[in-house]
Design a protein with these regions (language model features):
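P-loop NTPase switch/coupling surface
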Residues: 1-98, 126, 140
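Short amphipathic alpha-helical segments and helix-helix/interface helices
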Residues: 52-53, 132, 222-226
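Amphipathic alpha-helical domain-onset/packing element
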Residues: 59, 106-149
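Residue-level recognition of the N-termini of beta-strands and the immediately preceding loop/turn
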Residues: 60, 144, 199-203
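A structural signal for short, well-ordered beta-strand segments and their strand-loop junctions
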Residues: 63-66, 143-148, 156
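Short catalytic/ligand-binding loop motif for oxyanion handling, primarily in non-cytosolic enzymes
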Residues: 71-75, 97, 111, 166, ...
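Short, compositionally biased low-complexity segments
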Residues: 93-113
Length: 234
């Protein structure tokens, strides 16, 4: 009996010690979290379970962009089918395939025209028209044109008073904007089926959004983002 009592006493002490350690650890991590959020707490009117369900179905976007944003996209030497995903993890970078996706769209449009699929070809033509309009908003210049060279399979941007340039030779300010815009477009594109209506909901965190932007862009960047992506919480 004495032995059993001793064992029980030891277990109770161990459980008590373990509980105190757990409480201490929990208090530490809560304190660290509060420090990292600077006292800011997020409250959602939807459960995390529902958010996760929508995210996994591709109906909710979660993205994070660092302060040192530099847009880079692979320049393809030949046509390659881009397999867009219905959803991307926060650490994935679909924007790296953007130029490949543009080329894929152009070839799909050409095949649709030759195959008599006029509705499909028209949908893609409208997509490119709307993307060109978006570029005009970003550069704040109505002379902006997106030009495709059928010989080299390369896209370039042309505007009055400047030599043509491509997506990988943008100034740091415009590269920082396109890094966000293009990435979000591709995160939503499969679900929207080329509608260019980026109405999917989501949460996007941008570190030092004004970095690299000149004064005019700093004033207009949030208006641009919330107009193009009306249901994203930036």
């Amino acid at each position: 009996k004495t032995t059993k009592k001793g064992i029980q006493y030891y277990r109770e002490k161990q459980d008590e010690r373990s509980l105190k350690q757990s409480e201490s650890s929990l208090e530490y991590w809560v304190e660290q979290y509060q420090k990292s959020t600077a006292g800011i707490w997020l409250n959602f009117n939807t459960s995390f379970t529902e958010i996760r369900k929508q995210f996994e179905a591709g109906n909710f976007v979660v993205a994070y962009y660092k302060a040192d944003r530099i847009f880079t996209s692979v320049q393809p030497k030949h046509v390659e089918k881009v397999q867009l995903k219905s959803g991307y993890a926060i650490n994935e970078m679909p924007r790296t395939e953007f130029i490949k996706y543009l080329l894929d769209l152009k070839m799909t449009q050409a095949l649709a025209i030759s195959g008599g699929k006029t509705d499909k070809a028209h949908t893609i033509a409208i997509w490119f028209e709307k993307f060109e309009q978006l570029l005009k908003q970003i550069f704040d210049d109505e002379s902006v044109k997106l030009v495709f060279d059928e010989e080299t399979f390369q896209f370039s941007i042309e505007m009055d008073g400047r030599e043509p340039f491509d997506f990988n030779t943008l100034s740091s300010g415009y590269a920082a904007i396109l890094d966000i815009v293009v990435d979000l477009i591709l995160r939503m594109e499969r679900q929207l089926n080329r509608s260019f209506d980026f109405a999917i909901s989501g949460i996007v965190l941008i570190d030092e959004i004004e970095t690299h932007l000149h004064l005019e862009l700093q004033k207009n960047i949030m208006k641009l983002l919330t107009t193009v992506f009306p249901n994203i919480q930036f």
